[in-house]
UniProtKB/Swiss-Prot annotation:
Lineage: Bacteria, Pseudomonadati, Pseudomonadota, Gammaproteobacteria, Enterobacterales
Keyword list, A-Z: Antiport, Cell inner membrane, Cell membrane, Ion transport, Membrane, Sodium, Sodium transport, Transmembrane, Transmembrane helix, Transport
GO BP annotations listed: sodium ion transport; xenobiotic transmembrane transport
TM stretches of this protein: 11-31, 53-73, 93-113, 127-147, 160-180, 188-208, 243-263, 276-296, 314-334, 350-370, 387-407, 418-438
Protein name as annotated: Multidrug resistance protein MdtK
Length: 457
């Protein structure tokens, strides 16, 4: 029991700064929406539309680079720190190539926006302008993630937290300058949010790079002499590890986007109630998501040390802590669901629906916690391909079709509206959780030599 308590302490020490960093990042999006809304409703809508396209694109790049964390954690655990600098340099090359691809996609996103049904031309122009300003921040964001993943792979999660709050503090005044046109800058409205956020991502990258360059604990990594040229073999391996993670993130984001589109014809009350429950659930999701990142670090580090038993301890501890957290948040959600809904809206019908959906959200949180921590464990084992297949099957083969049938058809019961989609979420996430656990058990039962050989690739 003592080893699990010690492991839980180390996991929480890693996870808490990640939680705070995620809160800072979420707050940046909230600040953009509120400040754009203060300028005009059209500008706020433009930021919302632009963000709905930006998120899947940038999260794809983000997921691709998540491969660096277990790679660095295992090199650190095995005492092969002399190889870390080369991996990080190739991460920067990969981030550069991916950011160019993302920028190209976002520059041409106007075709998607203008193809939306009955969209106001002025709104479309503002959304395109916002994206074309924001896309210049894509390289800064991805370069920042490379440096952050380096730190997290070395079990240093506090720098990412500090840089997240620096970004938030810089974002507010820079937003103000570019939205309203102060200090000689043009008045850009919602487009100014894109300019400000892009600038903030570069500030965060420069600040993180400065930390990495000057941190005493990384002196031996900085002093390593390696060629700075692209290494196709290393980048190919990073892509092989990262692409399944990127696609899994993409599937998850697009699933919720598709459900939002399917709910939209049902009416304002249904859309509002669904959005309130989803927004609150996404806030609660920060906890298991951050714990998942910590579990990846601990499992990777233990495998690097050559101890499959300690890796199992880290995995089991992460799951236990995650289920405890999810149980607490589920009880909180059930107990205060009406008060939570009132924070968003005062329409009685919306509050009633949102409170009902939050009962389903409470169940959803437990399944979600298990599956996202399971994903973190599999990343630690470098078993990322299974994450892709599990996510695709659970979300798109099981979750979405069952949700659609329950919500909009009478094949099983009378159409349930948004609640049907939420039952679909529960089916999908529970299926993902079960499959993640089965895959984890399969990996852990392999001979230690095979586990360590797979992890060292």
């Amino acid at each position: 029991m003592q080893k699990y308590i010690n492991e839980a302490r180390q996991l929480l020490a890693l996870a808490i700064p990640v939680i705070l960093a995620q809160i800072a990042q979420t707050a940046m999006g909230f600040v953009d929406t509120v400040m754009a809304g203060g300028y005009s409703a059209t500008d706020m809508a433009a930021v919302a539309i632009g963000t709905s396209i930006w998120l899947p694109a940038i999260l794809f790049g983000h997921g691709l680079l998540l491969a660096l964390t277990p790679v660095i954690a295992q090199l650190n655990g095995s005492g092969r720190r002399e190889r870390i600098a080369h991996q990080v340099r190739q991460g920067f090359w990969l981030a550069g190539f991916v950011s160019l691809l993302i920028m190209l996609v976002l520059w041409n996103a106007g075709y998607i926006i203008r193809a939306m049904d009955n969209i106001d031309p002025a709104l479309a122009d503002k959304a395109v302008g916002y994206l074309r300003a924001l896309l210049w921040g894509a390289p800064g964001y991805l370069f920042f993630q490379v440096a952050r993943n380096q730190c997290e792979g070395l079990a240093k999660t506090k720098p990412g937290m500090v840089m997240g709050f620096i970004g938030l503090l810089v974002n507010i005044p820079v937003n103000y300058v570019f939205i309203y046109g102060h200090f000689g800058m043009p008045e850009l409205g919602g487009v100014g949010c894109g300019v400000a956020t892009a600038a903030v991502y570069w500030v965060m990258f420069v600040a993180m790079l400065s930390y990495v360059k000057n941190a005493r604990s990384m002196r031996d990594i900085r002093n390593q002499q390696h060629s700075g040229k692209p290494d196709t073999a290393v980048m190919k391996r990073l892509v092989q590890l990262g692409l399944p993670i990127a696609l899994a993130l993409f599937f998850e984001v697009t699933l919720f986007a598709v459900v939002a589109l399917l709910v939209s014809p049902l009416g304002i009350v249904d859309v509002a109630g669904h959005q309130i429950a989803l927004n609150f659930s996404s806030l609660m999701f920060v906890l298991p998501l951050s714990l998942s990142a910590a579990v990846t670090i601990r499992v990777g580090y233990r495998l690097g040390q050559g101890s499959t038993l300690d890796a199992q301890t880290a995995a089991r501890t992460g799951l236990m802590v995650g289920v405890c957290m999810a149980t607490v948040t589920a009880i909180f959600t059930v107990s205060f669901r009406e008060q939570i809904a009132l924070l968003y809206n005062d329409n009685p019908q919306v509050i009633t629906l949102a409170a009902h959906l939050m009962l389903l959200a409470a169940v959803y949180q437990i399944s979600d916690s298990i599956q996202v921590i399971g994903s973190g464990i599999l990343r630690g084992y470098k078993d990322t391909r299974s994450i892709f297949f599990i996510t695709f099957t659970a979300y798109w083969v099981l979750g979405l079709p069952s949700g659609y049938i329950l919500a909009l058809t009478d094949l099983v019961v009378q159409p349930m509206g948004p609640a049907g989609f939420w039952i679909g979420f529960i089916i999908g996430l529970t299926s993902a959780a079960i499959m993640m656990m089965l895959r984890m058990r399969y990996l852990q039962r392999l001979p230690s030599a095979i586990i360590l050989q797979r992890a060292a690739r």
